[in-house]
Amino acid sequence: MPADPVPPLDPLGAAYVDLAFAVERHAPGFIDGYFGPPSVREAAEAAPTAAPADLQRRAGDLTAAIDAADLPDARRDFLRRQAVAMAATLRRLAGEAIPYREEVRLLYDIEAEQTPEARFEAAIAELDDLLPGRGPVGERMVAWRDQFTVTPEGARRLIDVIVPELRRRTETIVPLPADEAVEFRFVSDRPWSGYNWYLGNNRSRVELNTDLPIHATRLTDLLAHEGYPGHHTEHALKERLYLDHGRGEQSILLINTPECVVSEGIATLAEEAVFNPGELVDFRSEVVYPAAGLSGDPAREIAIGRAQRGLKGVDANAALLLHDAGRGDDEVVAYLTRYGLESEARARHRLRFIRDPLWRAYIFTYHAGHGLLGRWLAAAPDAEARRARFRTLLTEAVTPTWVRQAMATDPIV
């Protein structure tokens, strides 16, 4: 067998990775990416499939080993909370019925909080004033979005002008590896609108789902989310924790663990991390719209986008209706159309995501991640401190608890 092209895993990292591959046998898709030694993957895939109950015991052994090891506090916190999440997944795989809110807490180190509908009503009232035309706000919202729809070919042209600017601005926050790269592809029949597959060695493949309309007004945000300074940037920089610092757990990316809250928080804040509102207006009006052959009012559209942030908790509330309150599909779709201002087709696509066994709790990572990380960044005393905090999130493996503690002590990072 040829030598592995990357460093070996440390014992604790190896135990963590082995357990993750064992969980993947029962929950396909649990591993979002692996870029450690190929021999470790090959050995794990060749091993007999262990029962979830046996894997629960291994998760307990891993937690005990983490507690006994001489580790920096931040690494211990990361490993321990990831192990707790794996143990919770194994409990469900073993047939245990975990209440939905407890499941969210164990998987993600956050609470499954319901957003008051009064907040949605206030956002909808603001949108009623901002959106052109007359009639129901939801219909006007859909019509407003649809006027900015571009074809996949048009989106490809926009990618070519948007991504270089996002990358340039990202490098004002943190240096990027010289050989990093992202490939963009268009796909269909997926439960999400866009997805980053991190391949290791500073490479990503980003897939955009053509089942859903691609809007020029949202494309900068989507590309920032998936690429610069979002998922691709974070994964490329955190891979260095494995390659340069021997942290084997950073050779693998796992779904349904606390790292997802931080990752989605980074991604949902990515566009505003590199553009202030005035810069975004200028970029859209001077670069994006001419390239798309569109005309518009970027200042108004950005104001509409800001008002839409008040609807960020709608999907999470819908998930609570479905999984916690036991409401039916039609009621959940009606909730999404009423408060999310979605078309019925798009609402049913959202329902597909929150009903999927792998993704059923994941919806909380977006809302909670944006809120938690956004509050910490907003509390920084100045723009340079905000950039430093965002850089920390991109380069250090931290948990939601770490961010909450950082806010409590308010360090200048």
Question: PLM features: what roles do these ranges have?
Answer:
Residues 1-413:
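N-terminal maturation segment of proteins
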